[in-house]
Regions:
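Solvent-exposed loop and edge beta-strand segments that line ligand/cofactor-binding
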Residues: 128-142, 185-197, 281-297, 359-384
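Short Pro-Gly-centered flexible turn/kink motifs
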Residues: 54-73, 300-303
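Low-complexity, Ser/Thr/Pro/Gly-enriched N-terminal "stalk/linker" regions
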Residues: 75, 84-135, 156-159, 163, ...
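Extended, well-ordered alpha-helical scaffold segments
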Residues: 79-92, 107, 111, 115, ...
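Catalytic cores of carbohydrate-active enzymes
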Residues: 175-176, 299-384
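Glycine- and aromatic-rich loop/turn segments at beta-sheet edges
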Residues: 120-132, 170-186, 217-220, 256-285, ...
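Aromatic-rich carbohydrate-recognition surfaces in CAZymes
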Residues: 142, 149-263, 293-297, 301
Length: 384
């Protein structure tokens, strides 16, 4: 009978009952015990160390189970490491602001408060940890999480911003994902697919950090670069300030503005992975065509205004301020001319983008399959 904690080891298929089963349909969970225990697995299997805890929760109650995992050659070292980790765990979420949400009664206040508290908790967890099953860390994910968490853990986020900026290419291109290098002699692995929007999140996050904290000293912190080519990563000796990193990122993005529409080339894609392919072209000898991401274009417009404001606090950047103001005006003109779709009744909507040579549009009244679609993200960034 299942009356207490069950612990054991098995394989993924042993726990779920079949390799094709999803975790929520695991036979072990339904039976309350590990279905087929194993002390070793084949090379093609995933090893599982599983606990099952019997819990009974009343309304609005919750339980969090935290595991401390230590690896050492002797029990004494494990015990010391575990004690240190337990102490840290107690204080990890101490800075999360206390919330008490009041509503008009249409939404349960307790449920909404509980939900938002867990959103903050998850945000801080993601900002602090490498929250991936694999080794690659998404640079967009890092900066999105930091932009939120800096509201209550600004000092920690400051260090993480500086750290992550050290993985930027010398030309200002940000990788899609990166790993921490195993040693000084071995460069990190990176996902170098040219998603155009990586850098826009970085600039906005640093701007938010400055707006919230007023700590402009971060702009003078020094960090490095990597040499990025199509499929290789190499160390770079170049080092300069956080501010110079932001300028390089912006200049890389601006270099990818389309000459005809003044909007930002999508290249491999943008944040909306479902629309990867807007940058494709059939032209021989070209990796990408003139396809555009309207969402990323508006993010760059926002970046230009953010950098203009940042640079007014710095000396010797008058030319850059002029450049970013002119670029913002150029982008606005292009967006108003090309990014607004109108139907026969005079109704209008914001496009998500278009393909090479504007051969087709996405998020318009008549997409290439004849259907009308709306892009939530491009409309949201038009407002922002």
């Amino acid at each position: 009978d299942y009356g207490g904690k069950v612990s054991g080891t098995t394989s993924s298929s042993g726990f779920k009952g079949a390799q094709s089963n999803q975790l929520y349909a695991s036979e072990s969970l339904f039976e309350g015990k590990i279905r087929r225990e194993k002390t070793y697995t084949e090379f093609t299997e995933n090893a599982i160390a599983a606990d099952m805890l019997p819990l009974e929760l009343k309304a609005c109650e919750s339980v969090a189970v935290t595991y401390t995992i230590s690896i050492a050659d002797d029990e004494k070292t494990v015990a010391v490491a575990a004690a240190k980790a337990e102490k840290k765990i107690e204080n990890v979420y101490a800075d999360i602001p206390a919330l008490k949400i009041a509503t008009d009664g249409s939404i349960n206040e307790t449920a909404l408060t509980y939900f938002l508290h867990n959103v903050l908790r998850q945000t801080e967890f993601c900002a602090r940890a490498k929250n991936y099953a694999g080794e690659l860390i998404g640079i967009r994910d890092i900066f999105q999480q930091l932009e939120c968490a800096l509201l209550w853990i600004p000092d920690y986020c400051r260090g993480k911003i500086i750290e992550a900026l050290g993985f930027i290419g010398e030309d200002g291109r940000a990788p899609r994902q990166y790993t921490y290098p195993r040693s000084k002699d071995v460069p990190p692995k990176m996902d170098l697919r040219k998603f155009i929007d990586q850098g826009v999140w970085i600039i906005s996050t640093v701007y938010t950090y400055l707006a919230v904290t007023g700590d402009f000293s971060i702009l003078n912190e020094t960090c490095g670069y990597y040499k990025l080519s199509d499929d290789t990563v190499a160390y770079s000796d170049k080092r300069d300030s956080v501010l110079e990193h932001l300028i390089r990122i912006a200049d890389f993005l601006i270099s990818n503005l389309d000459e005809e529409t003044d909007c930002l080339h999508a290249l491999y894609g943008d944040w909306n992975d479902a629309l990867d392919g807007l940058g494709k072209t059939d032209d021989k000898g070209k990796d990408y065509g003139t396809g555009v991401s309207v969402m990323a274009t508006m993010q760059l417009y926002k970046n230009c205004n953010e950098l203009t404001e940042i640079l007014t606090h710095e000396k010797e950047y008058a030319d850059k301020i002029k450049t970013y103001k002119a670029t913002a005006a150029r982008i606005e003109k292009g967006l108003r001319k090309y990014a607004i779709d109108e139907n026969k009744d005079g109704d209008k909507k914001i496009l998500h983008g278009w393909g090479d040579k504007r051969a087709y549009k996405v998020g318009c009244y008549c997409d290439n399959d004849g259907k009308s679609r709306d892009s939530a993200t491009s409309n949201a960034f038009w407002v922002l």
